[in-house]
């Protein structure tokens, strides 16, 4: 294998690794996938180093090494991308495809989004159902549904316009709190606090916290701390949005 061909393989592997990192894959899965691709494509070994904003990858073959670095731009979590890459890896391992196949397949990968109106409806229903389980009356149930559905729509629109995630969470929390406060200001519900609390549940950054814990537990401390800080910042942004809405409406708390 000459140096030029090894360079192409290195760039293809790191492209797959960056895609997985951008869409929320666990760090150990990214490393294992890169190593499997390297072996399947004919290099002796693959070494990878990850931080939240970049990946450094080196391929070794007969005492010849190629190193490359790529920046990671975080995007909304999408496990369909991760699954597609895993399928490509399995196909290369089983059928001995070359790097051209890998590059072609990576170009074909597109996020598999659900219908946006279905997402809006299901998020609203999930938050409203949680409110009902916590003992809300039917008025609070429907207000929670309206508030969280509208908030999800706002979140989608802001994401489509490529707003920073922190700003998106803050504005979404503000919107949800403003709408759900109808149950408290007009006295039409006996359980307004439940509606206020339940309407912002769509903003809980659970995936970031779970991944941060798993990464830290498995030795990827930099990735773990980075994802933990991301979750903390999103939580703070959500809290600021709620506080601003409550201050405007002079609501004293849940």
Model-identified regions with their sequence ranges:
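Alpha-helical transmembrane segments and their cytosolic membrane-interface
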Residues: 74-140, 230-239, 250
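Core alpha-helical transmembrane segments of integral membrane proteins
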Residues: 113-186, 190
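Generic detector of multi-pass transmembrane helix bundles and their immediately adjacent loops
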Residues: 185-254
């Amino acid at each position: 294998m000459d140096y030029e061909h090894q360079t192409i393989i290195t760039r293809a592997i790191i492209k797959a690794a960056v895609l997985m990192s951008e869409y929320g894959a666990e760090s150990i899965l990214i490393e294992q996938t890169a190593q499997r691709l390297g072996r399947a494509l004919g290099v002796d070994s693959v070494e990878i180093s990850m931080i939240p904003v970049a990946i450094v990858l080196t391929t070794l073959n007969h005492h010849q090494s190629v190193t490359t670095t790529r920046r990671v731009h975080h995007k909304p979590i999408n496990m369909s991308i991760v699954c597609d890459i895993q399928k490509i890896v399995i196909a290369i391992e089983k059928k001995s495809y070359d790097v051209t196949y890998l590059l072609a397949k990576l170009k074909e990968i597109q996020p598999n989004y659900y219908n946006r109106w279905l997402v809006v409806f299901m998020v609203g229903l999930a938050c409203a159902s949680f409110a009902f389980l916590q003992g809300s009356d039917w008025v609070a149930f429907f207000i929670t549904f309206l508030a969280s559905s509208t908030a999800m729509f706002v979140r989608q629109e802001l994401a489509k316009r490529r707003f920073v995630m922190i700003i998106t969470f803050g504005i979404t929390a503000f919107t949800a709190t403003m709408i759900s406060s109808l149950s408290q200001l007009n006295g039409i519900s006996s359980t307004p606090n439940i509606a206020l609390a339940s309407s912002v549940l769509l903003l809980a950054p659970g995936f970031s916290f779970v991944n941060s814990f798993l990464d830290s537990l498995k030795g990827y401390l930099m990735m773990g701390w980075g994802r933990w800080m991301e979750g903390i910042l999103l939580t703070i942004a959500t809290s600021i949005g709620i506080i601003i809405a409550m201050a405007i409406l002079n609501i004293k708390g849940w």
